[in-house]
């Protein structure tokens, strides 16, 4: 991946760190001069990805979450990575309302939210080894 700037952040899979993570990524994205709406989209998608790591990847146990962000031209690509339990069936997990946690509020909407607010979404996962969620947002009108 070619890029003109990048950052990497590691933090514990604690819910208190979710707002910290989205704020760091939003600050990094600010160099692209996004609109308030574009920043809100990025923050929402990062929040969903980090929350998925905490709840599903690590099942509320402590592990490390890594966020990498890359800027190239007018786009930002964000990778949210965990070394948790992984996803058995990515296609099924990405279906709206699919959840393994029926008791959770907004269950089954994480990937749908990420797809809605970002321009591209890719998920790579190996059961027992972890998951990488890669999201791309084009800032401005040229995609």
UniProtKB/Swiss-Prot annotation:
Listed GO biological process terms: asexual sporulation; negative regulation of sporulation resulting in formation of a cellular spore; sporulation resulting in formation of a cellular spore
Molecular function as annotated in GO: ATP binding; protein serine kinase activity; protein serine/threonine kinase activity; sigma factor antagonist activity
EC category name: transferase
Keyword Transferase found: yes
Chemical reaction(s) catalysed: L-seryl-[protein] + ATP = O-phospho-L-seryl-[protein] + ADP + H(+); L-threonyl-[protein] + ATP = O-phospho-L-threonyl-[protein] + ADP + H(+)
InterPro entries hit by this protein: Anti-sigma-factor_SerPK (IPR050267), Anti-sigma_F (IPR010194), HATPase_C_sf (IPR036890)
Entry similarity comment: Belongs to the anti-sigma-factor family.
Name listed for the protein in its UniProt record: Anti-sigma F factor
Gene source species: Thermoanaerobacter pseudethanolicus (strain ATCC 33223 / 39E)
Gene behind the chain: spoIIAB
């Amino acid at each position: 991946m070619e890029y003109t700037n990048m950052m990497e952040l590691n933090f514990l899979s604690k819910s208190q760190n979710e707002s910290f993570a989205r704020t760091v990524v939003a600050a990094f994205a600010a160099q692209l001069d996004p609109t308030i709406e574009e920043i809100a989209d990025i923050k929402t998608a990062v929040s969903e990805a980090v929350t998925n790591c905490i709840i599903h990847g690590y099942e509320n146990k402590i592990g490390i979450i890594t966020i990498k962000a890359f800027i190239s031209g007018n786009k930002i690509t964000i990778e949210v990575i965990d070394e948790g339990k992984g996803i058995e069936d990515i296609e099924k997990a990405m279906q709206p309302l699919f959840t393994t946690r029926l008791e959770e509020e907004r269950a089954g909407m994480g990937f749908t939210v990420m797809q809605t607010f970002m321009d591209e979404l890719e998920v790579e996962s190996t059961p027992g080894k972890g998951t990488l969620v890669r999201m791309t947002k084009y800032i401005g009108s040229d995609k």
